[in-house]
């Protein structure tokens, strides 16, 4: 799966065409009101581009929440239609369903640059292909899925996918729209462009910074990165599993230890040596007497070890300096996983200092990519937008790409040639 060879909305002639755009309008809501419209704002450049380039109609489809394959009023996209209308500055017609004869008729007769928002795709079990009933999963009927996908296909002439955050899911709206031109929108294109820079043709030295809790959860990620990078910083909770297994530290107290992951550590270290990948671990820690924002804090080094009733919740100043040196040597940097429990102020400095070093490296010309999820949350919290090359919008999707997996929603896009 080449990331850099996918058809983009810029490659298409949109004049007098109906354009079906899969957006990600999965926005937080409270009492029927949108509490953060960022995802809607991010989708607008693709919508505006289609309108500015003569599309006869733009039809938007999205999911919201987890309604489990049935219509649930609190997950209706109706409030989103009003927000899109406000931000676009033009009327948006909201349809009460996303498939079926009435929806097909409304979309097929739309002209003059009309904008339509369909109701939540996940109100139908056929979107995700299954639903949870009590403790078991019920699969959607294959014939019904085919019909659902055919109805989505009937809505437009061209399909555009701008929902990178759902690209790792083989849902009907991601892989089942059978139009001859299936292109990436601007958000999707930017994600593919930057991940291609890292995974297909990185400027070197190439550094990965991997944090998070469990080695066993990140095994595929570490394995895949060891095949690609020149150096790897291991931080966050999973560093303790490495350090204890390799006897690099006297004792780790109550710090996270991943028993299953510990069995994989020696092979990973061996692979790093074979591939000539430099491994960098923290050497000192900010410790806590409990896992809480109001915990008493302490300090420990590898040589001292962490006392029995204490746990490491962040890396210390010496580690931050080590990490900074490695970051500033690098020309391509991918960061996935914070280096401490940044949600608690007392244990946020390690993650903050990694972020500052990544920003510094960006200024010096490095390509810097921050994976989605917690790392993106931390980066946005401290105002890094525009100061690093790319902050991914997809937690699970970016992780799977970095693990070397194919994303169904990307595979389904047309290639340029």
UniProtKB/Swiss-Prot annotation:
ADP binds at residues 212, 236, 342. Keywords: ATP-binding, Cytoplasm, Glycolysis, Kinase, Magnesium, Metal-binding, Mitochondrion, Nucleotide-binding, Transferase. One of its GO terms (biological process) is glycolytic process. It is found in: Cytoplasm; Mitochondrion. Pathway: Carbohydrate degradation; glycolysis; pyruvate from D-glyceraldehyde 3-phosphate: step 2/5. The keyword Cell membrane does not apply. Its main location: cytoplasm. Signal peptide: none annotated. Its cofactor is Mg(2+). Its EC number is 2.7.2.3. HAMAP family: Phosphoglyc_kinase (MF_00145). Belongs to the phosphoglycerate kinase family. This is Phosphoglycerate kinase 2. It comes from Rhizopus niveus.
């Amino acid at each position: 799966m080449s990331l850099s060879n996918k058809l983009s909305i810029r490659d298409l002639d949109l004049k007098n065409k109906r354009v079906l755009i899969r957006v990600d309008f999965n926005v937080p809501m409270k009492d029927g009101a949108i509490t953060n419209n960022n995802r809607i704002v991010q989708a607008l450049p693709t919508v505006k581009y289609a309108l500015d380039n003569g599309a006869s109609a733009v039809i938007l489809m999205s999911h919201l929440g987890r309604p489990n394959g049935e219509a649930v009023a609190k997950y209706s996209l109706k409030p989103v239609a009003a927000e899109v209308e406000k931000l676009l500055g033009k009327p948006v017609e909201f349809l009460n369903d996303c498939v079926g004869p009435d929806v097909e008729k409304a979309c097929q007769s739309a002209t003059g640059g009309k904008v339509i928002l369909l109701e939540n795709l996940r109100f139908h079990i056929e979107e995700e292909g299954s639903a949870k009933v009590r403790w078991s999963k019920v699969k959607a009927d294959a014939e019904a899925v085919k019909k659902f996908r055919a109805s989505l296909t009937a809505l437009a002439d061209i399909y555009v996918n701008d929902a990178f955050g759902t690209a790792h899911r083989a849902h009907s709206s991601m892989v089942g729209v059978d139009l001859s031109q299936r292109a990436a929108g601007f958000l999707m294109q930017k994600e593919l462009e930057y991940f291609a820079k890292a995974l297909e043709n990185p400027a070197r030295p190439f550094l990965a910074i991997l944090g998070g809790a469990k080695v066993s959860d990140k095994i595929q990620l570490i394995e895949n990165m060891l095949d690609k990078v020149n150096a790897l910083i291991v931080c966050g909770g999973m560093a303790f599993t490495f350090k204890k297994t390799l006897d690099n530290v006297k004792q780790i107290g109550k710090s996270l230890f991943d028993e299953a992951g510990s069995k994989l550590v020696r092979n990973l270290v061996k692979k790093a040596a074979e591939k000539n990948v430099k491994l960098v671990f923290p050497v000192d820690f900010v410790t806590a007497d409990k896992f809480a924002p109001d915990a008493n804090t302490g300090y420990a080094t590898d040589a001292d070890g962490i006392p029995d009733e204490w746990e490491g919740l962040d890396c210390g100043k010496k580690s931050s300096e080590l990490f900074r040196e490695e970051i500033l040597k690098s020309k391509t940097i991918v960061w996935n996983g914070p280096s401490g429990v940044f949600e608690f102020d007392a244990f946020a400095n390690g993650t903050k200092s990694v972020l500052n070093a990544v920003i510094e490296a960006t200024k010096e010309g490095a390509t810097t990519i921050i994976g989605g999820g917690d790392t993106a949350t931390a980066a946005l919290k401290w105002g890094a937008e525009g100061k690093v090359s790319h902050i991914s919008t997809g937690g699970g999707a970016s992780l799977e790409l970095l693990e070397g997996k194919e994303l169904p929603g990307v595979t389904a896009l047309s290639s340029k040639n």
